[in-house]
Amino acid sequence: MAKFRLETSAERNGRNSVEGVERTVFFISDGTAITAEVLGHAVLSQFPIKITSYTLPFVASETRAEEIKQQINQIYQDTRIRPLVFYSIISSGVKNIITSSEGFCQDIVQTLVAPLQQETGLEPKPELNRTHGLTEKNLSQYDARIAAIDYALAHDDGISLRNLDQAQVILLGVSRCGKTPTSLYLAMQFGIQAANYPFTADDMDNLQLPATLKQFQHKLFGLTISPERLAAIREERRENSRYASLRQCRIEISEVEALFRKNKINYLNTTNYSVEEISTKIIDMMKLNRRMF
């Protein structure tokens, strides 16, 4: 019978040192798998790795764990490269099955829990779905987050200017500069009630801050973007239109930035930032209270 030889760590490291190496990654959890995904991606971002990922939540039975083990093993047999497995699992039976696979398995939570246990002298008491599940302890926080999402939707793109006193921040900017995704991310991730108001092409002839917004000056925050990037985004929406022309984008950005400066409104150029980075910078610059869920 033919035998195959496991490569040494030195051989594997030499092969993996090539820029852009591809690896298969599993994020496995007996809960939502959000924690495994977030922490796993944070670690993987440190390496020049192209990944094909599988996110497998609610792996609570040994039968399901065996199926996943077979999937991991099959990939290894086909490629002779161990899949990377980031897991967060409470059940020892399920955990043992996953870790007996041919994957390179990392307990994403226990790696941090063990030294913290040693430092505090406390015994951890893991509970299923504690981090992202709905419990009596976090019910009020959950309700606040849902209320923030409802608020963001009701006050998106200037739909309503009522109840702006309830907003923690009011985002201003031209169309397609990132106001809506940022408002929703602030609501979903941090429970922050964010409204947003657009400046349109029709406003440019005599651009002024609406009187309704002036009374909430301390809540206003501007978003801007490079005209080139804005034109590219708008072109996908309305191809070959005046709305998407570089000239129109330059006019709008110039006018809006002048308005921000005139009214002493803090603003951020979003061109090279993700929605996560934009939201975090707004929280920092506006000194908003962030709540994690």
Curated annotation (Swiss-Prot):
Enzyme class: transferase
Catalytic activity: [pyruvate, water dikinase] + ADP = [pyruvate, water dikinase]-phosphate + AMP + H(+); [pyruvate, water dikinase]-phosphate + phosphate + H(+) = [pyruvate, water dikinase] + diphosphate
Enzyme Commission designation: 2.7.11.33, 2.7.4.28
InterPro entries: Kinase-pyrophosphorylase, PSRP, TF_DNA-bd_sf
Binding-site list for ADP: 173-180
Family: Belongs to the pyruvate, phosphate/water dikinase regulatory protein family. PSRP subfamily.
Described purpose of this protein according to its UniProt entry: Bifunctional serine/threonine kinase and phosphorylase involved in the regulation of the phosphoenolpyruvate synthase (PEPS) by catalyzing its phosphorylation/dephosphorylation.
Name of the molecule in the record: Putative phosphoenolpyruvate synthase regulatory protein
Lineage: Bacteria, Pseudomonadati, Pseudomonadota, Gammaproteobacteria, Enterobacterales
